[in-house]
Swiss-Prot record:
Source organism per UniProt: Edwardsiella ictaluri (strain 93-146)
Family that this chain belongs to: Belongs to the YbaB/EbfC family.
Family matches, as Gene3D superfamilies: Nucleoid-associated protein YbaB-like domain
Biological role: Binds to DNA and alters its conformation. May be involved in regulation of gene expression, nucleoid organization and DNA protection.
Keyword line: Cytoplasm, DNA-binding
Subunit structure: Homodimer.
A molecular-function term among this protein's GO annotations: DNA binding
Name the record gives this protein: Nucleoid-associated protein NT01EI_1109
Signal peptide: none
Claim: Cell cycle is one of the keywords in the record: no
Cross-referenced NCBIfam families: DNA_YbaB_EbfC
Region (Disordered): 89-109
SUPFAM superfamilies in UniProt: YbaB-like (SSF82607)
Lineage of source species: Bacteria, Pseudomonadati, Pseudomonadota, Gammaproteobacteria, Enterobacterales
Pfam families (alphabetical): YbaB_DNA_bd
Amino acid sequence: MFGKGGLGNLMKQAQQMQEKMQKMQEEIALVEVTGESGAGLVKVTINGAHNCRRVEIDPSLMEDDKEMLEDLVAAAFNDAARRIESEQKERMASVSSGMQLPPGFKMPF
């Protein structure tokens, strides 16, 4: 199944990838993305740990329907969450690229 030194090399690659993933997770926790709704009238900024850092609401919305404003805030947060997930997937792909895995082997993440 594994060629000469294959298992040792695979273990070494797995350890290197684990170190890269740890570093990537630390970096992504610092990344901030901003989601928007209502054509930018509501903006929500979250970090890589999905913690809300900032909410910006255009003053024109303060006079409108409270329920609509709540919906816009939720939509902006969901947009930000999708953006941070996309960022995480991109970084994860770069961490695992180049690792030579046996056919059919799937990573546990």
